Amino acid sequence: MYTAKEVILSQIKPALGCTEPAAIALNGAYLKEYVKNAKKIQLTINTNLMKNAMYVPIPNTGKKFGVKLAFALGYLCGDKTKGLNVFENIDKKCIEEAEKYINKIELDIVEGREIYIKSEAEGCEVITKKFHDYISSIKTSEKVITFESKNIDNNISDTEKWLKKISFDTLYRLIEKEKDFDFVKNAVDVNFELSKIGLNSDCGLNIGKSYKGDDIFSKIVSITVSASDARMEGVNYPAMSLVGSGNHGISAILPVWVYGKEKNFQENEIFKAVALSMLITIYIKLFIGRLSAICGAAFASGCGVAGGIAYLESNNKEVSKKAVSYVIQDINGVICDGAKMACSLKVRLGAKSGYEAAMFALEGKPVFSDGILENDITKSIQNLSRVSEAMYNVDGSIVEIMKNKII
């Protein structure tokens, strides 16, 4: 049995910009340690990773993007000790060098939904697997090194296996056993700072700024989406990522926190509800997949927001579960067509659906076990896993469309 704190801390970490380009760059930074100034590099990534790395702006580049560019920046200028903040020190000179270097990189796309990156040069091979910052092996002409990178919790796999075996109700027991929720404070602070950047400057699509009302819903959407606007712009400030995604962290954390602050709940109560939202998001993501055809920033985090806000107001797990069920019925089929600045629109959708679902549940509106919804919410989420698997061909079609435009 793991604690709520252990589960959450295993799944959060700061990440600068979108995590897929960062993962690619980090792989390049590791390759540089063994092969410098390679005349040719063979880069292989899986389809879903490519989908989320192709068109999203890279931090500190002035909105430049591209899979090869991300790798070249990491290979030429990246610091592997920075982990998913690998783009932190990118400057103009590095960008110019990287743009020239991309002609030396050959890119191959292979089928697969699980994170996979392999770079090869002059007899050296670096492989990233399963997690964005997990360098699983490094092979040189002299030796093979298999190891856990410093940026990954060795117990993540065991934690995830355990989570997929427990019931949804167990999440509430984990939350109730925790007494002090200060461990989520840093995540709230980091993402709120990112939101302030989005609110105070022109970032991404500037969707967050469109919500100017003083009502609680407008404030939730404005603050949450502004953080995503800033992140997808590629500003030089990290998001606190959740389950490998900055937008998941933003959209699971900020709506619940804003709601609690606006309603004047005690800080520990708010952090408790935020922790529940994060747990629900993690739980659902493990069933639909880290990289899938379903947009987790809208759907999984939306479920977390609904459950967190409803629990904060009612302190009743049945009301909270009902709220989650509303989101399942509302937006369960929203697709992910790759990371880009427009992702802030889907973050908006998750915040909206989560907030409204919580209100419906608190008003006592009925929930019916139709469609993919079951009387047992654990089974409903297992059904979502089946839907996600069945959408593999949908995902493939999206990736094929994007491959025809590949840069």
From Swiss-Prot:
InterPro entries linked: Ser_deHydtase-like_asu, UPF0597
Entry-linked Pfam families: SDH_alpha
Residue ranges that the Swiss-Prot or TrEMBL entry lists as coiled coil: none
Protein's GO biological process: L-cysteine catabolic process to pyruvate
Recorded GO MF terms: L-cysteine desulfhydrase activity
Organism superkingdom: Bacteria
Family affiliation: Belongs to the UPF0597 family.
Protein name as annotated: UPF0597 protein NAMH_0191
